[in-house]
Amino acid sequence: MTVSAIKIIEPGEIQGLPDKDMPQLVVPSPKHLFAERASRLEYLAKDGELKGWLEFCAMLAKAQSEVIDKVSVASVDDSLITGSLKNHIPPLSISTWKVNEEWSTVYQKFTEQLAANKLPQKATESIAAFSKLSPDDQAKQVIAFLNADEASVRPEYAPFIGAALQLIWTKRAEQLAAYTEFYKGESSLCPVCGSHPIASVVRTGDRDANRFMACSLCASEWYGPRARCTNCETPIEVSILGESQEDSVQGECCDECHGYLKLMLQSKDPMMEVMADDLATIGLDIALSNEGFQRTGRNMYFLSGGEQETKTS
């Protein structure tokens, strides 16, 4: 891949404040989310060197879509939601969550659905190996991955842990649909759960030309000013790196912290799905790494492979 750097204009010039009627926080509809993700992954897997990898990821998303209606989570108190959002505290913070029966039930339902869909042998062996761990060791793996302590996580367990955690958090985040208007502000971490973004996306429709951060865990999206580093929040403009200006997925790269987050332009590919298109553009990650930049976004289907300076909620 040929990577070229294109400097963008100052943050204040590229975009001012969002329109007052534009939603600044959007929470997911899990059933549609996972079905669309599976469909997009199946489409992206048709050709190219990543065919096998994307087919496996499509199986994960398909199982998520098939099991999501069987997932039940505890309800969240109304006053906790409104109070937290008003005070810029994630109401579903990962920092206070513990591995519990809810997790065990969701993980079991998810992996049983995967087994019914005829997983590759290596994936089946990884699930079996995880099941042989003691409950304490399982919990350590889950909590480490949830909190982005990726060095402590076995890579073969990551896709299954991550997918099950997404089932829980998207279902929990769905409960906030009636309260999103209480969120006003800016955040580099998800205002719903406190997780890292997977990428930023410039949407069309009622959020036309505005940049939103997409959560890697709960799939909520929140407004973020363009041309600003989402990792260190320096006022210095970021660079856009990619094969060409016409690419629908590029890298927002910061010369201060040397981190990058993918930028996805829905206007260039209306069918894009943030997590799926992140998985399909691993070549861009490799190219940006070769340019000296470190990935700051997360994808719950794999480990990023580098030490990430992790913000906490």
Where are these regions (language model features)?
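Cys/His-clustered metal-coordination modules, chiefly Zn-binding fingers
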Residues: 173-292
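Long, contiguous alpha-helical scaffold regions
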Residues: 1-80, 263-313
